[in-house]
Each structure stands twice: as C-alpha cells, then as structure tokens.
Regions:
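Short, ordered beta-strand-loop transition motifs
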Residues: 31-35, 88-91, 101-102, 140-144
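Ser/Thr- (and often Asn-) enriched beta-sheet segments in non-cytosolic proteins
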Residues: 23-28, 39, 43, 61-63, ...
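Extracytoplasmic electrostatic interaction patches
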Residues: 104-168
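Intrinsically disordered, low-complexity segments enriched in small/polar residues
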Residues: 11-12, 17, 38, 57, ...
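N-terminal export/targeting and maturation segments
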Residues: 18-77, 160-162
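Mature extracytoplasmic domains of secretory-pathway proteins
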Residues: 60-128
Length: 168
C-alpha cells in the first residue's frame, strides 16, 4: 500500500509539473539604500516559451532583515521598479521597459532557448545581469537617484560590459 501511495504521489507531482509555469532569473536590481534586491524572472510555459500574457515576475528578496525572504512588490514599489512589456508577434519577443531605467528600452526573448533581457550598454547589445542604483534620501524621505550602473555581457562575445548613467 505504501508503494502504491508513493507511486501515485510521484506521478501526480510529475503531471502537475508538466503544466506548471517555470521561472528563470533574468537580472536583479541592487540598491545603495540597503541589502534588499529586486529580482526579475522570466515566466516560461510548459512548452519552454515565454508566457505571452505574464512574461515577467518581479519581487523583493529581503536580505536587510529577513534573510532573503521573498516579498511581492507593492503598488508604491511598482512605480519605481515596475515594468511594461509589449509582445511582438512577428519577432516572437517582447519590447520591455523597466521604470527604474526607462530611458534604456530592452528586448526580452529566448536566446538558445534561455530567456534573456537585451539592453544597450556602451551602445553594445548585452544580456543584462544587474542594475545598481545609487540614491540619496530626498524630500519626504523619498529616495532621489544619483546614478545607476548597468552590468551585462555582450550578446556576440560574452565579454563583460558596465556603464554608469548619471540621472539629472
């Protein structure tokens, strides 16, 4: 009886996993304010394609006080760390704008069947790995961004690229 139960459980787990969406890390945002990071994951369907209706999951990883615990972005957080995507059916990818770096549009697509966010770093197409945001406390305690840095690897060569962008 125990073997039958174990088999049924494993079979059910396997079937559910076939139809469940999977997530793969795209990049993170680190900030000078504290150790918490914002993580962006691509959401893949069970066929390995990026989910057209809900392509990205963005959330906090709380390292400052909660040992890396996950927390959803609030409505207020989304004003700074949210994003917009638009599916391009012809190219089978997404135009992607991150509010934190809205002047640097991206493309979200599959490269060798792995989801990647492509952004221009030093005018070179790169796979984005990390954004670092340096900020100071502004009026009413709302942080004011001084600059941000983009970190990635060139799409064509894999060479590391980094660019600091001052915010006016």
């Amino acid at each position: 009886m125990k073997k039958v139960f174990t088999f049924c459980f494993l079979f059910l787990y396997y079937v559910v996993s076939l139809y469940a969406d999977k997530t793969i890390n795209l990049f993170v945002i680190e900030r000078s304010k504290n150790a918490n990071i914002v993580k962006y994951d691509a959401i893949l369907t069970n066929t390995g394609k990026i989910n057209e209706k809900n392509p990205i999951d963005a959330y906090w990883l709380l390292y400052a006080k909660k040992n890396g615990e996950r927390e959803e972005l609030s409505s207020f957080d989304k004003k700074a760390y949210g994003f917009k995507t638009n599916y391009n059916k012809e190219k089978d990818n997404f135009d992607f704008v991150l509010k934190a770096v809205k002047d640097k549009p991206m493309i979200l697509g599959l490269y060798n069947n792995v989801p990647k966010a492509v952004i221009k770093i030093n005018n070179i197409d790169c796979f984005l790995e990390k954004v670092y945001i340096e900020s100071k406390d502004g009026a009413l305690g709302i942080p004011k961004v001084s600059y941000y840095e983009l970190f990635g690897k060139e799409v064509s060569t894999g060479k590391a690229q980094q660019q600091e962008i001052l915010v006016k």
